Amino acid sequence: MRARISVSDKTGIVEFATALKNLGWELIATGGTLKVLRGAGLEVLDIQDITGFPEICEGRVKTLHPKVHGGLLGRRDKEDHMAQLADNGIQTIEMVCVNLYPFEATIAKKDVTMEDAVENIDIGGPSMLRSAAKNFRDVTVVCDPADYAKVIEEITANGNTLPETRLQLSAKAYTHTALYDSCIAYYMRRQAGLDEKLFLAFDAVQTLRYGENPHQAATFYRSPKEVSYSVAYSRQLGGKELSYNNIQDANAALQIVREFSEPFCCALKHMNPCGAGVGKDLLEAWTRAYEADKVSIYGGIVAMNRPLTAEVARLMKPIFLEIVMAPAFEPEALEVLASKKNLRLLEVKMDNVKEPQKQYVGVNGGLLVQDYDVECKDITADMCVTERKPTEKELEEMDFGWKIVKHVKSNAIVVVKDGATAGVGAGQMNRVGSAEIALEEAKAAGITEGLVLASDGFLPFDDTVELASKYGVTAIVQPGGSIRDEDAIKKANEKGITMLFTGMRHFKH
């Protein structure tokens, strides 16, 4: 039994090769892999000993040879195949262990040149993977170090890998080469100025009970690249399996949390925040978020940007919640919530690096792609367009409200006071309708003065300003940009309201 080994990622390769050698396998390698294995004291054949042909073209041609591919592709159950191999002095190869040049990592470098990229396009590796994968009935193909242990275990127990394992590894190898080639194609098309073709690769991580509704089938997929503030890469510490709607809501909550560096907590329902608050510590942030809407939080999701403490966990415990998300959970907090068997607890990586990412939205027969809306301007006094300038307190409140309204379904209006939401108006077909909802919520809570209003889009008329003035709003932050901006400014001046234009819109559909 012979194994051809050539890996760029050398994780666990010495241990894997040693195990094969101890099981009586003959090892064949080239280049860096050959050096590493021989350096570990293993007896390994150089591929040149097999082909009788040297590496040429600076290593570009090493394994593209009939004595390699014939040994992989020849079917053991066909007499004519075996006779042809024998006539040409070709021995069979029963395993290929290959992973490829790091093309994706190379083109991710800011200073990468076309020459660097091209030299990291693997030719021999994909060819061997495809040959071995095609002949999976006779050949084991390994492209992932995570599979080393299983392969050794099966060979130890059975003398070879199991047929079903070889089929699975074959499928994995073809997936690996397909993704590799799609990455190269995407890069080369961009360099050539051709129309882009989009190649997406996501790994299925969970078959969901159902989708948005019980009659819809659904699966949860994860990007191969780990990112922060991600449900897909969270660690579940307790509770039931996540549902489709849970995942949608949790993702929306995490995008709000990432806006804040100070202690912050929010509650969310149906992808809209129902309560949010900042504070000097998590306890104050939680209290403000909860007090903002004690009713809507029922059956909702809570997310925070500080480790969950036992103190806050005790306050949460009596409330029916679907999910609690935090960067960490104090051991005592986990003990407090341990009796809530259905409550999903997600530990989420939260760093404040706003990695550029693409957002994909399916439409019937197509796909929309855009940059994630990770930008959010800091609110400053020089954005003021009215006669009255904002106080420091109003600036703080506007900054808070602006970060929240960005994540509310359009048309979106949020009113805030004292570092917490006082009312949220979401998803209405006209802006003044959303304003009425938010302002009435604040009024119902007894908050009727010193309010700050934030709008995700410009105010097309002065009616929202007029309405806001009747509910105790003293400051408004909006993008500006309407042909009737002057009407809104004039009305604000009449009412003594300070108003800021950010110059940036945050629609959310």
Q: Language-model segments: which ranges?
A:
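ATP-dependent carboxylate/acyl-activation modules
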Residues: 1-5, 95, 180-184, 188-509
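N-terminal glycine-/serine-/threonine-rich phosphate-binding loop
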Residues: 1-50
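Hydrophobic beta-strand scaffold residues
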Residues: 27, 44, 139-141, 345, ...
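Glycine-rich nucleotide/cofactor/substrate-binding loop typically near the N-terminus or early
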Residues: 32-103
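Short gly/pro/ser/thr-enriched loop/turn and capping motifs at secondary-structure boundaries
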Residues: 33-36, 51-57, 103-105, 127-130, ...
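Active-site/ligand-binding-proximal alpha/beta "capping" segment
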Residues: 76-126, 130-133, 383, 387-392
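Mobile "lid/hinge" segments at catalytic clefts and subdomain interfaces of large enzymes
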Residues: 128, 135-148
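Non-catalytic interaction/clamp surfaces of large macromolecular machines
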Residues: 145-146, 150-198
